[in-house]
Structure formats: structure tokens, C-alpha cells
Amino acid sequence: MAYPFQLGLQDATSPIMEELTNFHDHTLMIVFLISSLVLYLISLMLSTKLIHTSTMDAQEVETIWTILPAIILIMIALPSLRILYMMDEINNPALTVKTMGHQWYWSYEYTDYEDLSFDSYMIPTNELKPGELRLLEVDNRVILPMELPIRMLISSEDVLHSWAVPSLGLKTDAIPGRLNQATVMSNRPGIFYGQCSEICGSNHSFMPIVLEMIPLKLFENWSISMS
């Protein structure tokens, strides 16, 4: 859950988000080192009186500043590709949930169960209970079992939407006529908030997403009560 004036990323709840956080730190450190080197060279050029007016060719220098950026790009690309493959890989999901975007609410269908589906609307501000979050609470939360791989099939009934839950490292476009998929897996129980992250009309800001991750036994009891 984000908090006011937060500078960093939200606390990672899934293995994917942990990898994304590590990759962010890895890339940020490379950018910091490059920026420091550039600032140092600029300050050196401004402060020194030494010039090389007679230098017409420098093969060694050109070789270094060609090979070094290539190595840096490889250091960024390899972990990035690894995470991309991890995000696309879904092996033997324990549960499949179909998510449909509408103007302006979400609908969910648990495809492994008969007649287990519902719509999820934002709770208006005047109906919120003490302690509930404005513009983030919904009337029907998505209940999922923790510590199990879950496949989300995401699409849209009308316009472009985007199903995003930052603490789980999820952001998948909901496109009419196209079925995208994402993997959901939580390391711990809790309630995790997200929002539609694609401008989809006048009420775009009123499409929150709430996932409630619970132990498997409690999820089974909930699914029986909903069927």
C-alpha cells in the first residue's frame, strides 16, 4: 500500500515484484555511476587548461568508448530479459480467474468453479466506513489463495483498460477482442490495492482493484459459500 510522499516502490509481495525491485536498484546504480563519471569529466574539462589540438586520431579511446557502453547495455539487458520470461511463464496454475474491464468497473469469473462470478464496483465516498480508503475500496473483493500460482486472463468489453496492482508487480492491458494473461502469486496474506492504469473515459479514476490473499483453507470455505 502506498503512503503520502512515498519515494520508493511499494513493498514487494510477490517473487516477480521482488525481482523488479532488485532490477530497479541494479539499473539505478548503473545510471548513478554513469552520471557521476560524466559530471566528473565535465568538471575536469572546465577546470583544466590542457588541450590536445594536434590529436587527430585515437583508436584506443574510440575502442574503449565503444566496448564499454556495449558491456553496460548487456549488464542491463540480461536481467531484464530474465524477468520478462519469468513474467510470461505460467506453469500449472492452481486457479484461473477471468477479468473483464468495463466502463467503469471490473467483473471477475473463477473459471474452475461453476457460477462463481461477480462485478466489482468502487464504493462511493459517502458510503465508506471508518478506516476504509477513498477511491480504493470496492463492494466485492477478489479473494485468492496465497502462495499458489494463479493465472489471470484479462480482457475488456468496451475500451482499453489496464489491470494493475503495484505491490504484486502486475500491470496488464485489457484490450477488447484480445485475451492477455498474467501470473498472480503472493508470499503473504493481506489486502492489496490497484487501479485501472489506462485512461478509459470520464470515470477512469473510479475503477479500483482490491485483491485479498488468504490461506488456501479459508479460500476453499469462501468458494463454497459463494457457490
UniProtKB/Swiss-Prot annotation:
Q: Which InterPro entries match?
A: CcO_II, CcO_II-like_C, CcO_II_C, Copper_CuA, Cupredoxin, Cyt_c_oxidase_su2, Cyt_c_oxidase_su2_TM_dom, Cyt_c_oxidase_su2_TM_sf
According to its UniProt entry, the protein's GO biological process terms are:
ATP synthesis coupled electron transport
**Keyword list, A-Z:** Copper, Electron transport, Magnesium, Membrane, Metal-binding, Mitochondrion, Mitochondrion inner membrane, Respiratory chain, Translocase, Transmembrane, Transmembrane helix, Transport
Q: What is its main location?
A: mitochondrion
Cofactor binding mode and count = Binds a dinuclear copper A center per subunit.
Q: What cofactor does this protein call for?
A: Cu cation
Cellular component per GO?
Answer: mitochondrial inner membrane; respiratory chain complex IV
Report the catalytic activity: 4 Fe(II)-[cytochrome c] + O2 + 8 H(+)(in) = 4 Fe(III)-[cytochrome c] + 2 H2O + 4 H(+)(out)
Question: What EC number(s) would the UniProt record show?
Answer: 7.1.1.9
- Name-wise, this protein is Cytochrome c oxidase subunit 2
Question: Which organism was this protein described from?
Answer: Gerbilliscus robustus
Which gene is transcribed and translated to give this protein?
Answer: MT-CO2
